[in-house]
Amino acid sequence: MSAKAQNPMRELKIEKLVLNISVGESGDRLTRASKVLEQLSGQTPVHSKARYTVRTFGIRRNEKIAVHVTIRGPKSEEILERGLKVKEYQLRTKNFSETGNFGFGIQEHIDLGIKYDPSIGIYGMDFYVVMGRPGGRVSRRKRCRSTVGNSHKTSKEDTIAWFKQRYDADVLDK
């Protein structure tokens, strides 16, 4: 912190971390991917369905094709740290959205420190991080809903600065 005390309501925080494994088909591979997410997060993953039929990929509408899990709190920070270690704390500017969220993918889940199990195999996964500030709930709640001012919304620049400072990381301009 600088000499002048920062406003605690302006501090960025991780609202949630979403881990997604998109298998592209239902069946045994999807249940094995579900086990990987359960091992990693300790929570039961949710299945995602296909929105529409794509004959070239062999996907039917409403067929379960992916699994994801939402993690909040300190556990999300710990899992994110493991994911960033795999990426060697380097992300690109295009990994960050205009609303201040960011995401990245890894090729192999065993890089996260999970022991390899031949019956499960190796899966890649996507990490999506939703950033926010205290007071952001006023725009989402049902009763007495209000708007958040532009100066209080999270921006791409704010998140990049937070990311560099928090994880001592690099953001590449590729």
UniProtKB/Swiss-Prot annotation:
Q: Which SUPFAM superfamilies match?
A: RL5-like
Subcellular location(s) of the protein = Nucleus; Cytoplasm
Q: By its UniProt entry, which Pfam families does this protein fall under?
A: Ribosomal_L5, Ribosomal_L5_C
Gene Ontology CC entries for this record:
cytosolic large ribosomal subunit; nucleus
Gene Ontology molecular function: any one: RNA binding
Q: What is its main location?
A: nucleus
- InterPro entries listed in its UniProt record: Ribosomal_uL5, Ribosomal_uL5_C, Ribosomal_uL5_CS, Ribosomal_uL5_dom_sf, Ribosomal_uL5_N
Q: Which UniProt keywords apply?
A: Cytoplasm, Nucleus, Ribonucleoprotein, Ribosomal protein, RNA-binding, rRNA-binding
What is a biological process (GO) this protein takes part in? translation
Family from the record:
Belongs to the universal ribosomal protein uL5 family.
Quote the function comment for this protein: Component of the ribosome, a large ribonucleoprotein complex responsible for the synthesis of proteins in the cell. The small ribosomal subunit (SSU) binds messenger RNAs (mRNAs) and translates the encoded message by selecting cognate aminoacyl-transfer RNA (tRNA) molecules. The large subunit (LSU) contains the ribosomal catalytic site termed the peptidyl transferase center (PTC), which catalyzes the formation of peptide bonds, thereby polymerizing the amino acids delivered by tRNAs into a polypeptide chain.
Share what the entry says about its subunit structure, partners included: Component of the large ribosomal subunit.
The protein, known as: Large ribosomal subunit protein uL5
What species is given as this protein's source?
Eremothecium gossypii (strain ATCC 10895 / CBS 109.51 / FGSC 9923 / NRRL Y-1056) (Yeast)
